[in-house]
């Protein structure tokens, strides 16, 4: 049976919850509709997060992202909605979603939204000589 788009995000247990590490996911084929014109808007999404107890399952993420292809949404709203949905299920220590929309009317739009778990501070980056 072919997969169908849906909004049910799934997670799996973080294999190393005691460690801060970053997961980066690039989604080059995001599509939604312009709510003003009904024309498709295309974007590349860059998801970066530090998991706590759960990680997002990639097939469910793919189907979730696919569910936006026929939905009208402003760039700012859809970026923040996706971030809110992901943080609700994953409960990460930190998550950033950057949406780079393709040119529309000679204008490129990039929207970046972040979530940070209260009390969590990023570890210092080690700079080697």
UniProtKB/Swiss-Prot annotation:
It is found in: Cytoplasm. It catalyses: 7-aminomethyl-7-carbaguanine + 2 NADP(+) = 7-cyano-7-deazaguanine + 2 NADPH + 3 H(+). GO terms for molecular function: preQ1 synthase activity. One of its GO terms (cellular component) is cytoplasm. One of its GO terms (biological process) is queuosine biosynthetic process. The active site is at residues 34, 41. Keywords: Cytoplasm, NADP, Oxidoreductase, Queuosine biosynthesis. Its EC number is 1.7.1.13. It is an enzyme of class 1 (oxidoreductase). Pathway: tRNA modification; tRNA-queuosine biosynthesis. Substrate binds at residues 56-58, 75-76. It comes from the Bacteria. PANTHER family: NADPH-DEPENDENT 7-CYANO-7-DEAZAGUANINE REDUCTASE. Belongs to the GTP cyclohydrolase I family. QueF type 1 subfamily. Catalyzes the NADPH-dependent reduction of 7-cyano-7-deazaguanine (preQ0) to 7-aminomethyl-7-deazaguanine (preQ1). This is NADPH-dependent 7-cyano-7-deazaguanine reductase. It comes from Nitrosococcus oceani (strain ATCC 19707 / BCRC 17464 / JCM 30415 / NCIMB 11848 / C-107).
């Amino acid at each position: 049976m072919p997969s169908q788009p849906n909004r049910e995000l799934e997670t799996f247990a973080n294999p190393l919850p005691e460690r801060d590490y970053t997961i980066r996911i690039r989604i080059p084929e995001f599509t939604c509709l312009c709510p003003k014109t009904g024309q498709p808007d295309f974007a590349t999404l860059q998801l970066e997060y530090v998991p706590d107890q759960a990680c997002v399952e990639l097939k469910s993420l793919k189907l979730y992202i696919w569910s936006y292809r026929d939905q009208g949404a402003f760039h700012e709203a859809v970026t923040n909605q996706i971030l809110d949905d992901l943080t609700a299920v994953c409960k990460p220590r930190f998550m950033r979603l950057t949406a780079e929309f393709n040119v529309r009317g000679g204008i490129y739009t990039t929207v970046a939204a972040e979530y940070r778990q209260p009390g969590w501070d990023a570890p210092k980056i080690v700079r080697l000589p």
